[in-house]
Each structure stands twice: as structure tokens, then as C-alpha cells.
Amino acid sequence: MQDQGSDAVSMFDRHFLVERADNQSALQEAQRLRHQVFRLERGILPGHAQARLEADEFDHASHHVILRQRRSGQAVGTARLIVGGWQDGRIGGFPMLRYCAPGMLRDLPMGTTAEISRFALSKVRRQGGACMDGLLRYGLMRGILRISLDLGLTHW
């Protein structure tokens, strides 16, 4: 007999697919979904109104995940993993550094540290209730974990 966790994972796998956005077309799909969620649904981030994309200077140093509904192929979630590092002899490359005290991340191994951001779930999918919401978050984190393992990351 399977436990409830295994049943939930099986249900997720039947209905959703986690993909890496590893080309320009997939990246733009993730940016369109971010525009939809962050600008149109929540009104919290500026976006490129003409292109209907939510993009910033950190996208180029990021690995992106797309959560897709299997049946329709529709992207319903996205997140990114920003790979940081040293810039000009100091820690750089993470949006959170804009808000942290200087030196706060000094002890982290920058070569294996990343920041998770732009975690977005479509309003349409969020309406599925707490169970669905949890499964979708699980899916995005599964993608983030897969990328982290592939890159040898040790810290988020």
C-alpha cells in the first residue's frame, strides 16, 4: 500500500511536467507567465508592456524551470535559480543583496550558492485549492532541486 505522499507525487506526475527553460523560446514563455502573474494578476512588478514579458538583469545568470500541464501543454508555473558568484572581487549577482546588510553572505561558498526567485504560479491553477497549490509548489521545487544537483550547488 502506498502512503499519501507517494499518491500525491504519482498524481502530480500524471498531470504535470517539470521542464528546464533551456532555449530562448522557453525563457520567453517563462517571462510571459511571470508578466501574467506578477504584473497583471498581482500588480507587484513592472514588466515590458509591449512585449508582455517580465524580465530583468538577472535572467541571463539564471536557470529557469517551467511547470506545464500535460494535457494542454500550458505553462502554469515558473521559477528561476540565479547562480551568483564574485564580481569585481566582491559578492555579487543576487537580487537579495540589494536588501541585505553588507557582508551578510560573506561566509557562503559563492561558487555553489544560488538564489531562488520569480516563483510564480498562474491564478488559474492556484484556484485548485490547497492540495493543488502544494503540488504545484512541489513541482517547481523539484525542478529547482534537479538543476541544483546538476550544477553541484550546495546553498540557496
Please give the residue ranges for each predicted region.
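Short amphipathic alpha-helix that is part of the acyltransferase structural core
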Residues: 6-56, 64-71, 75
